[in-house]
């Protein structure tokens, strides 16, 4: 899924162990994105991995993001993961959603 979102919040970047990454660690952060249109639009909490996790976004930034959705089962429960494959800031635009 690739579309335009508004940034609601972004966590601090931290490092987690990874067998695939050089140096054995990968950068990771979480980001909250909402579809434009109003405060009751769909919102997503997604994980950003790798170098993209070091990019800082601010509240109300407009971004184009490609999200990958997956599910996994653990101890009889099903969980959904959302990972940001790509994220780009739309420069010089801010979107204010009426509360």
Q: What is the predicted role of each segment?
A:
Residues 1-99:
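Single-stranded nucleic acid-binding surfaces, predominantly the OB-fold ssDNA-binding core
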